[in-house]
Amino acid sequence: MKIRASVRKICEKCRLIRRRKRLLVICYNPRHKQKQG
């Protein structure tokens, strides 16, 4: 899980999700997981 100021999709299968007022990126590839900090 990477914590970044700006999250973005890395590949086609990445999905942007808003949970508890935080943006998350989830993907089948665990390297693409991101959270906005």
Swiss-Prot record:
Keyword line: Chloroplast, Plastid, Ribonucleoprotein, Ribosomal protein
Top-level taxon of origin: Eukaryota
GO molecular function: structural constituent of ribosome
Chief place of localization: plastid
GO terms (BP aspect): translation
PANTHER family in UniProt: 50S RIBOSOMAL PROTEIN L36, CHLOROPLASTIC, LARGE RIBOSOMAL SUBUNIT PROTEIN BL36C
Matches recorded under NCBIfam families: rpmJ_bact (TIGR01022)
Name under which the protein is recorded: Large ribosomal subunit protein bL36c
Species: Cryptomeria japonica (Japanese cedar)
Protein's gene: rpl36
